[in-house]
Structure formats: structure tokens, C-alpha cells
Design a protein with these regions (language model features):
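Membrane-entry signal-anchor segments at the cytosolic-membrane interface
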Residues: 2-21
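PDZ/PDZ-like domain segments forming the peptide/carboxylate-binding groove
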Residues: 24, 28-63, 67-70, 125
Length: 200
């Protein structure tokens, strides 16, 4: 009957909802302990687009194209998944908002396109309310990275070997990520979300 249909629906959605709630709780605990990386530039690389556009240390990046930026990792991930693309960057300095278009330069030594953004390994530890807000952003971040990774795989931008589970996804967003966070904790968190998205 009608009741059994709703009962079946509730059973189907209960698993994914519970998994996302668990991921949120884990993100909250994680951020309370190690903090989060704000999208504030520690500097800009000389001779690269960010410097040439007048950006400088202390600028806070708010948006790249139509994607809102909450972590410095958001910048790294977006530029990795849009390698070589000109991007519109919205940033804030001393309470004023600015917008500029950056076209990356190819770095022969490293073998990839660069905009010249420099981040910091420093983490910000916020209030309980702030950590709750950034926990939502954390879950959103990993969902977006996972989806963008799959799009890159389908589009032929990366190989299956590059996408070998959560480790492959993490490798896509750069070695600096591993150096700037408590890597083990994030791997556990990422695996929880990975399982949630694909097995729920």
C-alpha cells in the first residue's frame, strides 16, 4: 500500500543521508582540531598573471568564474580542472572588491599552467558557528572535486590510472595539498564521502 511505498523510499534515502551526516560530523571534528585554509594569498609569483594584474599578498579570493571560493584548496582544485583556461577572479582587498581576468602561463619546468597564486600552510581555527559553516563547505568541496574528477575522466583529460580511487583524486589537486594539511585525517574523510557518493 501507500505506507509501504513511503517506507521503502525512506529506507532508500536513509543510508545516503546518514552517510552525509557522518561526513559532516567528521568534517566538524576535523576543522575544530586543525582549522581550515582561507583563500588569502600569501604572495604572488613574479612574472605570472596574478602579479601582472596587480594582485598582492593579503588579497582574499572570493570567486573564480561562477564558483565561490571558501578554501585555498578551492583555488588549487579549480585551476587544476580548468588547466590553461582564462578565468575571471573576484577578490577583496581592504574591504573593496575587484575583478580581473587571468590567462595562465605554461611553466616548462613543472609542466603545467600557472596563475601565480601562492598560498600559506597556516590554518585558521574559528568559533563553533564558523566551524559548522566551514564543515558544510568541506563536504561541498569534496563532492565537487569528486564530480569534476569524473568529468575529467569521461572527457579524457585524465586516465583511469590517475583516477584510482580517492588517492587519485587527491593527487590531481597538487602536491602542495599533501604538504599543507594533516593528510591522514583528510584521506579518511575523503574515503567516507567517496563511498557515500558511489555506493549509497
Amino acid at each position: 500500500g501507500k505506507k509501504s511505498v513511503w517506507a521503502r523510499i525512506s529506507v532508500v534515502i536513509a543510508g545516503p543521508v546518514f552517510n552525509f551526516l557522518m561526513a559532516f560530523v567528521f568534517a566538524f571534528i576535523l576543522l575544530c582540531n586543525i582549522g581550515y585554509d582561507l583563500p588569502v594569498l600569501a604572495g604572488v609569483t613574479e612574472g605570472y598573471p596574478a602579479e601582472e594584474a596587480g594582485m598582492q599578498a593579503g588579497d582574499t579570493i572570493l570567486k573564480i568564474d561562477h564558483t565561490r571560493i571558501h578554501f585555498f584548496r578551492d583555488i588549487s582544485a579549480y585551476t587544476q580542472f580548468h588547466s590553461g583556461d582564462a578565468v575571471t577572479v573576484t577578490y577583496e582587498r581592504d574591504g573593496e572588491r575587484y575583478q580581473t581576468v587571468l590567462t595562465p602561463k605554461y611553466n616548462e619546468e613543472y609542466g603545467y599552467y600557472m596563475y601565480g597564486f601562492q598560498g600559506s600552510a597556516q590554518k585558521t581555527k574559528g568559533s563553533v558557528l564558523s566551524n559548522l559553516k566551514y564543515s558544510v563547505y568541506e563536504v561541498e568541496y569534496w563532492i565537487r572535486v569528486t564530480i569534476d574528477s569524473l568529468k575529467s575522466l569521461v572527457g579524457g583529460k585524465v586516465s583511469v590510472n590517475d583516477m584510482s580511487g580517492p588517492v587519485g583524486i587527491v593527487n590531481m589537486i597538487g602536491d602542495s595539498y599533501e604538504q599543507s594539511v594533516t593528510y591522514g585525517y583528510y584521506m579518511v574523510f575523503l574515503q567516507m564521502l567517496y563511498i557515500t557518493i558511489f555506493l549509497s
